[in-house]
Amino acid sequence: MMENSPKTRRLNILPDNPENTGDGVVGLGRFPSWLHRPLPKGNQLQITGQVINQNRLHTVCEEAKCPNLLECWTKKTATFLVMGKECSRNCGFCDIDFSKNPKPLDRSEPSRVALSVQQLGLKHVVITMVARDDLSDGGSSHLVEVIEAIRQTNEDVTIEVLTSDFEGNRKALSFVLQAKPEIFNHNIETVRRLTPRVRHKATYERTLSVLEQAAQKKYHSQLKVKSGIMVGLGETEEEIFETLLDLKRVGCEIVTIGQYLQPNRQKLLVKSFVHPDIFKKYEQYGLSIGIPHLYCGPFVRSSYNANLVLMRANQKEAIVNSE
């Protein structure tokens, strides 16, 4: 049998992991203890939901069935999903609705996002987008309109964008970077070997190219470049190390690593529930190779506690600059 075949490849499973079926697929009926947590309390959850619904907006929290929705909405934070809720791609991990012909852009959306930011009193806002390969600029101009609308009514708000790869359109990407968000995020999602299966319309190298272009900081010297990885899809520890090295090479400064959870039965199976000790191992390795900021854990998602991530990054940078 070949050395790199799935049957012999070492998965990120510790001995106490539940229900290993023998083929690397972990039974989904029982989550390990570290994937259980208490529900948050308080009425802020309803308040956040009301603001979003009244302004006719979408969030990735809802559309992608994020496990952190209750916690984040209780903390009065949400990741706005712009350009509709229909994506022109149908990635193997994502629960957002797929459409070959997404609905036209809503030109009132930027002002409604800005109003929601104001009503929620946000200090840091995360804007993500569906892929819009049906548009000549991939939706970059609409994303910039959202950024500008937020800034017009919320001067002190910091902005993080989580974008598609714009099909490699460097001009479209430059247009977004010129809007000077504080954080530019584009997720690599998985290791090189698994990319064709996990993100069939994206490529590993294109993602690195997008991040590298952003890391040049041509328009905004204080821009921080961020990317995220899902684990539990069948990758090995060595492949995660290689991916972290690639992210470091192209200038990525913030990396998030979290557990993949199957959003519905049509999507990719979970191959392993990764133990918290392994997440700590990834964090320590990333720091050892010079990535300044890593946030790794079972419930970590690319925009999870994004305001705290930016605050800690700025604090660490200030300490380094003062030495």
Curated annotation (Swiss-Prot):
Cofactor(s) the record lists: [4Fe-4S] cluster
InterPro entries (UniProt xref): Aldolase_TIM (IPR013785), Elp3/MiaA/NifB-like_rSAM (IPR006638), Lipoyl_synth (IPR003698), rSAM (IPR007197)
Main location: cytoplasm
Catalytic reaction annotation: [[Fe-S] cluster scaffold protein carrying a second [4Fe-4S](2+) cluster] + N(6)-octanoyl-L-lysyl-[protein] + 2 oxidized [2Fe-2S]-[ferredoxin] + 2 S-adenosyl-L-methionine + 4 H(+) = [[Fe-S] cluster scaffold protein] + N(6)-[(R)-dihydrolipoyl]-L-lysyl-[protein] + 4 Fe(3+) + 2 hydrogen sulfide + 2 5'-deoxyadenosine + 2 L-methionine + 2 reduced [2Fe-2S]-[ferredoxin]
Enzyme nomenclature, EC number: 2.8.1.8
Binding site for [4Fe-4S] cluster 2: C87, C91, C94
Pathway membership: Protein modification; protein lipoylation via endogenous pathway; protein N(6)-(lipoyl)lysine from octanoyl-[acyl-carrier-protein]: step 2/2
One GO term describing the cellular component: cytoplasm
Ranges that cross the membrane: none
Keyword check for Metal-binding: yes
UniProt cofactor note: Binds 2 [4Fe-4S] clusters per subunit. One cluster is coordinated with 3 cysteines and an exchangeable S-adenosyl-L-methionine.
GO molecular function: 4 iron, 4 sulfur cluster binding; lipoate synthase activity; metal ion binding
Keywords, alphabetical: 4Fe-4S, Cytoplasm, Iron, Iron-sulfur, Metal-binding, S-adenosyl-L-methionine, Transferase
Subcellular localization: Cytoplasm
Keyword 4Fe-4S: yes
UniProt domain Radical SAM core: residue ranges: 73-292
Residues reported to bind [4Fe-4S] cluster 1: C61, C66, C72, S303
Family the entry assigns: Belongs to the radical SAM superfamily. Lipoyl synthase family.
Official protein name in the record: Lipoyl synthase
Species the sequence originates in: Protochlamydia amoebophila (strain UWE25)
Gene name of this polypeptide: lipA
